[in-house]
From Swiss-Prot:
A molecular-function term among this protein's GO annotations: GTPase activity
GO cellular component, one term: nucleus
Subcellular location: Mitochondrion
Residue sites binding GTP per the record: 49-56, 116-120, 170-173
Protein name per its UniProtKB record: Elongation factor G, mitochondrial
Pathway info: Protein biosynthesis; polypeptide chain elongation
Pfam families in alphabetical order: EFG_C, EFG_III, EFG_IV, GTP_EFTU, GTP_EFTU_D2
Residue range of the transit peptide in the UniProt record, numbered on this chain: 1-15
Domain tr-type G, chain residue ranges per copy: 40-317
Single biological process term from Gene Ontology: mitochondrial translational elongation
Membrane spanning stretches: none
Gene: ico
Family as reported in the entry's similarity comment: Belongs to the TRAFAC class translation factor GTPase superfamily. Classic translation factor GTPase family. EF-G/EF-2 subfamily.
Keywords: Elongation factor, GTP-binding, Mitochondrion, Nucleotide-binding, Protein biosynthesis, Transit peptide
Length: 745
């Protein structure tokens, strides 16, 4: 503390102001949160990261400092209350976030809508949904773990939706924390043009505060829960480093921003406002990532992070949101939605999440244009169904606040709206508007599921109906071959969570079978077909002929199915073409080699023939069935399997054992790195070989190793693996035994 500050503190009754101390009361407001605000006073942000990086703890601190909650609770707190945003009992028990939760709060008279998202890879669709409707994000990184597998996934998702972000290096208080290593990983692994705008004053148990490089001041967090901020001079032993890091920040900004670059070349001194303006411009354009530091658990660095959200992340008016106008026979026309909060344009909103609440189905929406009031009618652009708005609510985790109207930029919820995730709503059905939908990854793991008691079947059906509607990555189907019900999802944890929710929320205990991999079947090369379906034995008959070719799609599209109508003339009348496509898609549900779905195939219908009386859509559908059976016999087929990106971290002495086990599981090592007695290995391993790996890793590393994995792509199986899958399928169908009998005879 400087001498002048000390004298002022001792002598003046206004000593808090002299120390430039700020309490949360000066920042937050207990005014009505849902009141209408100008567009520059709104931020829509998400908090995303790898599992256990401290996202939910950070959100809890944000809500506390902004006056939204009166006391803080920890994620796995001893008081058994749990974090505010983890409202589901399972979330509090496991200490993980399963669903993204929405809330809103006020900071310096700005309304901040926050979505806290899961970090676990099995719930990645929750992150997709959140990022689709946000204008900015806070990417939380652990000061020890650094850039981990799910961090890279979230980074890819942010890139897909062009979401500007701030990076917050959390957990400075942990043993082994090294924010400088995390910054270098951000640059090397994530290709971010990133630099510190804050530095830690000490790490681990010596974490005292932070240095603000933009304002060139030290910030200390004092009082109960770090509510009072004291600004002081930068400590003597950090001045050289602070100057060097500030210069580094200026150089990175000058490379990313032309206006700032000109000032840099002219060698003019930079003001605080120059740097802040450049940070805002580059952050919104995604050409630079400001890096902040702190420890949410120890209440340090959260208030400056909130300031940065206001200063550097965009308001809804600074983000360009597009919609597509469907035109018959033409490509959709792109139009830019008007973000002004004046209600002059027709309402346009996107449903990004469905949830069955206590009062019926809850639909989360983001308003992109216009205004929506209670009593208005809106139309679903996909189904054209009309819905009357009886109730509008804003959400705070699992609590609600009724509002009379919402404007462009607001996140809100409706009751009783029948729709799907990614549906567009508008007040003018003639607009033909549709917004870009949400990317949904394919499920990779299936398990057999059945209720323990037959009397619970009704509740089981209700639970399945609700969960499949809420979560597009959770699928349910009945397998006729083995006569069992199956659920599919993004991983074992994903399916286990739903099984537990069935018991807790519906009183329906269920049994899950062993996990099964979602293999796919595809063609190796093109295969032509010419099939005639003819059934004319008196009365109305059936006649259809189709000619064409089935061919593989490129490897990067091997999870898709395509149908192309290349017919010219009237040999195959246009009204019968949908029948051919329907037959193709029906047959694609079950392949010949292993009974799994077909994928990565293009069906090209080139020619055919019809009968003036006996042809029908049904006849052409059956012709497609026959043509595909013909291709099953004549084509070369192979099985595709899901490949996972696996990241294993363990003490150095176990490196050989870990790499040996991954190789044994047909893994391909893609990289390794080591720090301070620990190593991390990155590999690509078939999902089929990863079952049981958790136990093996625990036993081979004395319980010290941990791993994460996420879906990467589908790739052809090894020949011996394919032979084994085909043999097992044939035996399950009784084909193997029949062949053996034939051979004996």
């Amino acid at each position: 503390m400087s001498l002048i500050t000390r004298l002022l503190t001792a002598s003046s009754p206004l000593r808090l102001r002299a120390m430039e101390t700020m309490s949360r009361a000066g920042y937050s407001s207990h005014a009505k949160y849902a009141e209408h605000r100008p567009i520059d006073k709104i931020r829509n942000i998400g908090i995303s990261a790898h599992i256990d990086s401290g996202k939910t703890t950070l959100t809890e601190r944000i809500l506390f400092y902004t006056g939204r909650i009166v006391e803080m609770h920890e994620v796995r707190g001893k008081d058994n209350v749990g974090a505010t945003m983890d409202s589901m009992e399972l979330e509090r028990q496991r200490g993980i976030t399963i669903q993204s939760a929405a809330t809103y709060t006020l900071w310096k008279d700005t309304n901040i809508n926050i979505i806290d998202t899961p970090g676990h890879v099995d719930f990645t669709v929750e992150v997709e949904r959140a990022l689709r409707v946000l204008d900015g994000a806070v990417l939380v990184l652990c000061a020890v773990g650094g850039v981990q597998s799910q961090t890279l996934t979230v980074n890819r998702q942010m890139k897909r939706y062009n979401v500007p972000c701030l990076a917050f290096i959390n957990k400075l208080d942990r043993m082994g924390s090294n924010p400088y290593r995390v910054l270098s990983q951000m640059r090397s692994k994530m290709n971010h043009n990133a630099a510190f705008i804050q530095l830690p004053i000490g790490v681990e148990s010596n974490c005292k505060g932070i240095v603000d490089l933009v304002r060139e001041r030290a910030i200390y967090f004092e009082g109960e829960h770090g509510m009072n901020l004291r600004l002081d001079e930068i400590p003597q032993d950090m001045r050289v480093e602070s100057q060097e890091r500030r210069q580094e920040l200026i150089e990175h900004l000058s490379n990313a921003d032309d206006t700032f670059g000109e000032l840099f070349l002219e060698e003019k001194p930079f003001t605080e406002d120059d740097i802040k303006a450049a940070l805002r411009r580059t952050c919104i354009k995604r050409t630079f990532t400001p890096v902040l530091v702190g420890t949410a658990l120890k209440n340090k660095g959260v208030q400056p992070l909130l300031d940065a959200v206001l200063e550097y992340l965009p308001n809804p008016g600074e983000v360009e949101n597009l919609a597509f106008v469907e035109k018959e026979g033409q490509d959709p026309e792109k139009i830019v939605l008007n973000p002004a909060r004046d209600g002059k344009d027709a309402f346009v909103g996107l449903a990004f999440k469905l949830e069955a609440g206590r009062f019926g189905q809850l639909t989360y929406l983001r308003c992109y244009q216009g205004v929506l009031r209670k009593g208005d009618n809106i139309f679903n652009a996909r189904t054209n169904k009309k819905v009357r708005i009886a109730r509008l609510v804003r959400l705070h985790s699992n609590q609600m606040e009724d509002v009379n109207e919402v404007y462009a930029g607001d996140i809100f919820a409706l009751f009783g709206v029948d729709c799907a995730s990614g549906d567009t709503f508008t007040t003018n059905p003639k607009n033909n508007l549709a917004m870009e939908s949400i990317f949904v990854p394919e499920p990779v793991v299936s398990m057999a599921i059945k209720p323990n008691n037959t009397k619970d079947r009704d509740n089981f059906s209700k639970a399945i109906a609700r969960f499949t509607k809420e979560d597009p990555t959770f699928h349910f189907f009945f397998d006729n071959d083995v006569k069992e019900t199956l659920v599919s999802g993004m991983g074992e944890l994903h399916l286990e969570i739903y099984a537990q929710r069935m018991e807790r929320e519906y009183g329906c205990p269920v049994t899950l079978g062993k996990p099964k991999v979602a293999f796919r079947e595809t063609l190796v090369g093109p295969c032509e077909f010419d099939y005639l379906h003819k059934k004319q034995s008196g009365g109305s008959g059936q006649y259809a002929r189709i000619i064409g070719i089935m061919e593989p799609l490129p490897p990067n599209q091997n999870t898709l199915l395509e149908f192309v109508d290349e017919t010219v003339g009237t040999n195959v009348p246009k009204q019968f073409v949908p029948g051919v496509e329907k037959g193709y898609r029906e047959m694609a549900e079950k392949g010949m080699l292993s009974g799994h779905k077909l994928s990565g195939i293009r069906f090209r219908l080139q020619d055919g023939g019809h009968h003036i009386v006996d042809s029908s859509e049904l006849a052409f559908m059956l012709a497609a069935h026959g043509a595909i059976k013909e291709v099953f016999q004549n084509g070369n087929w192979q099985i595709l399997e899901p490949i996972m990106l696996v990241e294993v971290t363990a003490p150095e002495e176990f490196q050989g054992a870990v790499m040996g086990h991954l190789s044994k599981r047909h893994g391909i090592i893609t990289g390794t790195e080591g720090t301070e007695g620990w190593f991390t290995v990155y590999a690509e391993v078939p999902l089929n070989d990863m079952f049981g790996y958790a136990g093996e890793l625990r036993s081979s590393t004395q319980g010290k190793g941990e791993f994460t994995m996420e879906y990467s792509r589908y790739s052809p199986c090894l020949p011996d693996v394919q032979d084994q899958i085909v043999r097992q399928y044939q035996e399950s169908q009784g084909l193997g035994q029949a062949d053996k009998k034939k051979r004996k005879n």
